[in-house]
Amino acid sequence: MAGNNSNGGTRKASKSKGKIVIFAIEILLILIMLAILFLVMTKSGEGPKVVDLNTEDLGINEISKTDSTGANAGGQNGADGTQVIDTGYLNVALFGVDATTPNGLFKGSRSDCIMVASVNKNTGDIKLVSVYRDTYLNLGTDTYNKCNHAYAGGGAEQAIKMLNMNLDLDITNFIAVNYQSLIDLVDGLGGIYVDVNKNELKHINNYQITINKDLNLGGYTAVKETGYQKLNGLQATAYCRVRYDLPGGDFDRASNQREVIKAIEEQAKKTDPATLTKVFNKVVDEIYTSISSKDLLDLVTNINGYSIVDEGGFPEESMRTTGNIGAKGSCVIPVDLESNVVWLHKFLFDDADYAVSNTVKECGAKIKSDTSSYINKR
């Protein structure tokens, strides 16, 4: 599984910010499913906070290169030789933002969890990729910094543009949540099952104390042993926060977050429709998205028709390093952006012959120029 481990030094790539980090990806898949159930069963037009995005402002790169056969490399070939979007996949950006109020979902909050969920609409297979929050990338404004700054500067639109420009993706939809969503979702499902190891155990309860205080939840239940066990919403959120004493630090934390998604999917498939509807009613006000009810209805008709089949992290483990980039602090650095993007398209779309856009080449050259003198200097 790509991107799950790293050497011990990589844990320095992420600093403690003394705040609760939110994990949108843990709830993306199930929120879509719950939205369908809610809209169908109650026939209500109410739902998440929805925004319309202009696709022309989302930084979708033009691909004009062709391979030796004349077919477009990395996508379907249009009449003019440029890439056209492969409608067999739906790519959705997922943001967890450090917002403590509903308005913080719109702009001004950093996205401390960034993921891409790619859904194969023909098979129902879903692949998940974490984009590590401290990755040094073009923010969509020709400014380079940690990629989680994009959401703070221009909200979801700029964050999507950042992903599309740097990764040659065609994302036009997103879901963003605040931190209360994960707690409410897991509790509504009756808890989820994960395997807690000894390094994680000693930090879960400390994070529970902090989260309980910040959210004024009125108490917490300590996790007392290691092993495969049921966690409630607060415990699961604390589990997603743990990175200290993990061999890969923040990289292993991102892997744990993806494990939580799979646990939520598994639990949701065992839950009756009436309970799922109640859960959606609970979390609906904590969601900000571009996905309309019609698109949701077109996408999802049967919860059992979708399966998470693979997951990984970007930059890929063998093609990343870390470095303190001056005033920008400790960053995750794609050693070669072009190679990482080729890997990403092979991983998500089984495209073995992908050729990156000129935009990715330009971004990669700038990243190398900015970071070469800082790499591995702690």
Question: What kind of feature is each model-predicted range?
Answer:
Residues 2-13, 17-378:
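Non-catalytic, solvent-exposed segments at the cell envelope interface
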